[in-house]
Each structure stands twice: as C-alpha cells, then as structure tokens.
C-alpha cells in the first residue's frame, strides 16, 4: 500500500498524534525525546540499543516532519503506508536479540527510478504513474535484508533528466517541482515563473528530504552529475561510486556505460554505512559490472573513517578549466573558471587540507584539458552519442524485463503515449531527448557509438584522471562543488562530496525587492576506479576538521 501525492491520511494522523503528545508531555519529557533532526544513523542505532527509542518512534518522528513541512518543499513522490508495521516487526526482532546490522530499523528513501514492489516506481513519468514492477531492484533487496525501512520514494527529474533539454532539476510530470529547502521560493522571473525553484535543487536525484531530516538518508542514481549536483545544492555528503560497485539491476536506465546508484546523507559516516549495504558482499549475477571492484572486508566502509586520513595524503588541484578559465585549442574561446567567491572558498578548503597534513600538488591539471592536439583535447571533443545510444539500447531492454505488466513495451510506445497525453501534462517540456534516442538505428550507429565510447574513456580516464594521478602519485583530485561530475562519470570513477559553505548566486538578476539567498557549495574528492575506501578516508578527515553542514533555516 502506498500513499500518493494527495496526502495523506497517515501523515495527518501522525501529525495529530505528534501534536497531542507534545501538548501532553511534561517539560522534562520534551528534553528527553530523541530528536531526529540532523541525527546520524549511529546515533539512532545507539538510542534503539539503549531502549530510549524504537524504530516505530523513529518512523513516527520522520513522518511527523514530512506532515509538517512537505508542502513547503515537495520532497516525496510516495510514502510507504506500511512503514509503521515494518518498524514494529523490526522492533520485535531487536527485542528477540536479532539485529541485522547498522541499518536495522532505520528509515531511508529511494529515488523513484529504483524498483520497489511495495510502492510504485514511476521514474517521474506519467505513463508509469501507479506502476508497481514485478520485481524489486537488487539494492532494494539489500536494504530490506539489512533491516532498513524504505519510507518513501523521492522526487526526481523525470526519467533521470533524459526526456527533454531545459527541464528543471527535480521536476517530473508525476511529482511536480521539488523546492530547495535553503530557499523554498519559486522563481519569480519572467519566462521562468512556471513553478520551478528560484534556487536550483540539482538533479536528477534529490537531496531535499534528507536535508530536511524527512528520513535518515537516501539513495540516488547518477549517469553524469545526478548524485553529486543535488548533494551540492542541498548541503549533503554523497558518494558517487565506481560504476559496478552497486548493482543497477532493477533501476530504470539511461546507459549501462555510466549508470550507478549511491548514497546521499548528512554525514560521511552515514554515507559509508549505506554504501556497504547497497553494494552487498557478492557480485550480482544480474549485473556483470558488479565484478569490477572488490568490497571491503565484511562490506564495512566505516573502517575507513579516520580523522587523521589526510595525514600524508597527496591532493591534486586541477586548475585548468575547473578552477581557472582556459583557452580551447584552435579557437579564441575560453572554457571553465569560477566566481571570485567560489575561488576564495576553495582556497580556504586547500588551506584546511594542508593544515590536516595533506600535501597539495598545485597545479595538477588534467592532461587531456591541456593537450594542444584537438584530437586529444577534452575541451574540443564535441558531443558524444553514448547516452542517446545507451538509452535506446538499455531502456528497451529494461522494459522487456517487466513482462506484461509494463505500461508501455518500447521507447517508441512511450513517446506515443506521451503525445496522446500531452494535455494531461506528460510533455510540459517536450521529449526531444527521447525522440533523438529512439530514432537511432542501433546497428547502423554502432561504429559511431563505439568510437565515442572509446574517446570518452581515453580523454576522461586514461589521458585524463588516470594519467595525472599516476604521474603525480595522487590520492585524489579536489574539485569545486560537483565540478568533477562529467570527467568522472564517463570512465565510471568515484567521487565523494562534502558540504563546505555558501556562495552568493551569480548571473541571477531578480525583480526589485526579491533578494536571492546564498546557495550551498561543497568540495569533491575524485579518484580512479574502485578507490572509494581512500576517498572516504579523505572526505571524513576533511569533514571532521570543518563540520560546515548546517540544516535548512526555519524548518525545525
């Protein structure tokens, strides 16, 4: 059973219960109540171990926050109406001495392109509204087996932002517009006043609900930037894993070449806990890519949470393009760079890294960015058919796994359905990307795709991140915000982003009397394939030295 966007008898009941309890409780009880706002997963586990709180209490507390604030931010597409029953069962297991692990009884949320059999999986597409798939994703099963309670499905950019160019982050026909809790106002500017947020949420995953403490953490997916950019926009930690680290079976795809799921959380600790559960300890036979990386002993990434993790580390600063503008070879154009305010924030981050014992290698420019040969230069590489080709190949293959229950059987049928239901809101921003992908002849376009894929791997991996890290013996590259998203996504390399500060928005002229608010900005540690353990060490040490995350204002 699922609660739809029409909210929600369950939420209203929980809200009423919460208000009643608050009004009846003596002052000393109020002080003793467990506060879920900004609470970490280990803190929740400790409270349950001590008997001061139950999983039911945690679910009720999170549902109460959703009931109080969801209308202001629109974080969820669906709520699990059986969450309290699941919590009761897990509480009974705990009472019997059966604790499954660090996620036992913890409420989490999934992006709505991750299959669940107890809630619909829509990808935000109207054609899939109410659709409950015949099987659940491997990562969903891993979470359930670990005792996690999947409390909700999050808003997302429709079909992971592969339906139309110009679609705002966290908009979908099913979910509407998600709003950034650091400024939950809508954009007042002419031409942009269609309901979209004035402060971007990133996309296509959503960090809104985790930032708001609607649940302990959530799982996003990324093809290029879709975990990192929403984490950056909502002051979250996120781990975008190596492609293959987490099974993609049962996740609505764009392309198997780059798709990956990963944790979004308020702390590095919580993200590390979640990553271990998502990965599992054995490769998934449904996803051969899961053989790429070895999991850590016992699947436990918390072993890498070292406060001294920066001691002796070598961190590279890829100045060209990512910090400073650089001329594109053979042209008079310049690419990249950042605002003075962002530059100052990154300079502060670098100073902190040095103070924590890291050696800063500056510059540590990406060789393919600096290569004078246009054939070997990342900035002149032009477009790539990899995503469009992959969408045609992999989306149709995914639809075939759904059997007769699928609302549509092919990408062509989805396009036709959307056209037939345009008046119902299926095509607010069109479907140009779907059209482009579906018109590809996979056999005729194979050679172009393979050449583009080889170029992507060479310029971003072999002649990019690999070359600079090997030559300079680096542990990681430090990028501003989610700036590493593209270059790390193409070869499928990992990144960990950590909240760090705020910057004034640039290039956003607002109507008189409407003051734009500062927007969050994090820092990212990127490495080569399967380097998550080292990146977690670095990110945790940086987080512990800074502790810059702040919860959204006015939402407590």
Please give the residue ranges for each predicted region.
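Sec-exported extracytoplasmic/periplasmic mature domains
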Residues: 46-53, 63-71, 84, 88-96, ...
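Acyltransferase
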Residues: 59, 88, 300-306, 338-365, ...
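Structural helix-boundary/capping segments
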Residues: 68, 149, 211-325, 331, ...
């Amino acid at each position: 059973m699922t609660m739809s966007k029409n909210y929600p008898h369950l939420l209203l009941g929980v809200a009423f219960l919460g208000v009643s309890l608050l009004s009846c409780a003596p002052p000393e009880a109020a002080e003793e109540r467990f506060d879920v706002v900004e609470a970490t997963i280990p803190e929740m586990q400790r409270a349950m171990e001590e008997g001061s709180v139950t999983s039911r209490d945690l679910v009720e507390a999170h549902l109460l926050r959703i009931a109080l604030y969801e209308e202001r931010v629109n974080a969820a597409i669906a709520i699990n109406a059986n969450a309290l029953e699941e919590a009761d069962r897990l509480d009974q297991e705990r009472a019997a001495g059966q604790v499954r692990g660090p996620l036992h009884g913890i409420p989490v949320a999934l992006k709505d392109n991750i299959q669940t059999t107890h809630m619909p999986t829509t990808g935000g597409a109207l054609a899939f509204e109410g659709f409950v798939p015949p099987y659940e994703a491997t990562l969903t099963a891993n979470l359930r087996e670990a005792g996690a309670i999947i409390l909700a499905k999050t808003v997302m950019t429709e079909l992971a932002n592969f339906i139309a160019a110009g679609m705002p982050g966290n908009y979908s026909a099913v979910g509407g517009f998600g709003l950034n809790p650091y400024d939950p106002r809508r954009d007042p500017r002419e031409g942009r006043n269609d309901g979209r947020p004035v402060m971007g949420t990133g996309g296509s995953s959503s960090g809104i609900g985790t930032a708001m403490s609607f649940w302990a953490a959530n799982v996003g997916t990324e093809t290029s930037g879709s975990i990192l950019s929403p984490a950056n926009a909502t002051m979250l930690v996120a781990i975008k894993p190596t492609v293959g680290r987490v099974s993609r079976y049962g996740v609505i795809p764009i392309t198997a070449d780059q798709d990956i799921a990963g944790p979004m959380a308020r702390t590095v600790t919580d993200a590390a806990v979640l990553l271990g559960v998502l990965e599992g300890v054995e490769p998934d036979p449904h996803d051969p890519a899961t053989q790429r990386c070895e999991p850590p002993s016992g699947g436990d990434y918390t072993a890498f949470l070292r406060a001294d993790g920066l001691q002796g580390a070598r961190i590279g600063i890829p100045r060209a393009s990512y910090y400073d503008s650089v001329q594109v070879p053979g042209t008079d154009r310049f690419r990249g760079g950042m605002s003075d305010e962002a530059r100052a924030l990154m300079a502060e981050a670098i100073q902190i890294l040095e103070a924590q014992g890291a050696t800063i290698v500056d510059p540590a420019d990406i060789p393919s960015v600096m290569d004078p040969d246009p054939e070997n230069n990342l900035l002149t590489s032009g477009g790539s058919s990899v995503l469009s080709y992959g969408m045609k190949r992999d989306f149709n293959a995914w639809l075939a796994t759904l059997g007769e229950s699928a609302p549509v059987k092919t990408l062509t049928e989805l396009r036709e359905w959307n056209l037939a239901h345009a008046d119902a809101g299926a095509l607010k921003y069109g479907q140009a990307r779907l059209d482009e992908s579906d018109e590809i002849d996979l056999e005729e376009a194979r050679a172009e795709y393979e050449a583009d894929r080889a170029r992507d791997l060479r310029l971003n991996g072999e002649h990019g991140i690999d070359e600079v890290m090997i030559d300079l013996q680096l542990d990681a590259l430090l990028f501003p915000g989610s700036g590493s998203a593209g270059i790390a996504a193409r070869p499928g390399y990992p990144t960990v982003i950590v909240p760090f500060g705020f910057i004034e928005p640039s290039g956003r002229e607002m109507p008189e009397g409407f003051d734009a608010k500062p927007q969050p900005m994090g820092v990212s540690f990127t490495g080569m394939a399967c380097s998550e353990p080292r990146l977690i060490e670095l990110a945790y040490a940086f987080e512990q030295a800074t502790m810059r995350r702040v919860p959204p204002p006015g939402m407590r």
